[in-house]
Regions:
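Aromatic side chains
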Residues: 33, 44-45, 51, 92, ...
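A cross-kingdom feature marking solvent-exposed beta-strand/loop segments within repeated
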Residues: 58-74, 94-103, 135-150, 170-175
Length: 175
């Protein structure tokens, strides 16, 4: 059985023999999360993580129904940004038959987004104060490309998972 700390090195060292097709990905635009309340979610993303509100919008009617393939969909949207990434928060106002999904990190279909941070312990404490709880204790990577990096998952009330990484090998964003 392979140690999980080898995964980052293995993926980073992988080479491909063929170039990507011309229609391939050339840039990441955003990561989207569906939440119960944009206002509650903004407390985490802005007050804890330090993102900035970029804009708000709403969608209803034919466009969003075709996009989601769900009749009667009405969405509220907030876009928030931090250096290098944008998060899209979506609050579904309709239809009413929605559910909260909270898969474990090992469950198929589980998704998370990861961020390097300046102070993992402070962020975990601030997150916990508003209901975003660490899934386990902070772990230290003991070898490979991420050696010395502390990391932890936190999950919010909506089931959104975020991985926090603090590394002595990655330049701090606080300058």
């Amino acid at each position: 059985m392979r140690d999980t700390n080898d995964l980052a090195v293995t993926v980073a060292d992988r080479t491909h023999s063929k170039p990507a097709p011309a229609a391939g990905v050339f840039r990441t635009d955003h990561t989207g999360f569906t939440v119960q309340s944009i206002e509650e979610s903004l407390h985490f993303w802005i007050d804890v993580m330090g993102f900035k509100l970029l804009g708000r919008d709403s969608f209803t009617g034919d466009f969003i129904e075709k996009m989601t393939n769900v009749p009667g969909t009405t969405l509220l949207q907030a876009l928030i940004g931090a250096p290098g990434h944008t998060i899209e928060l979506l609050q579904c106002v309709a239809p009413d038959d929605r559910q909260i999904v909270k898969p474990r990190p090992v469950d198929v279909g589980s998704v998370h987004v990861a961020f390097f941070v300046d102070d993992i312990d402070t962020l975990i404490g601030r997150a916990a104060a508003i209901g975003w709880n660490a899934l386990g204790p902070t772990q230290m990577v003991d070898h490979g490309a991420l050696k010395g990096t502390q990391l932890a998952y936190v999950r919010g009330p909506d089931g959104v998972m975020v991985e926090l990484l603090e590394s002595p090998n990655v330049a701090s964003g606080a300058s």
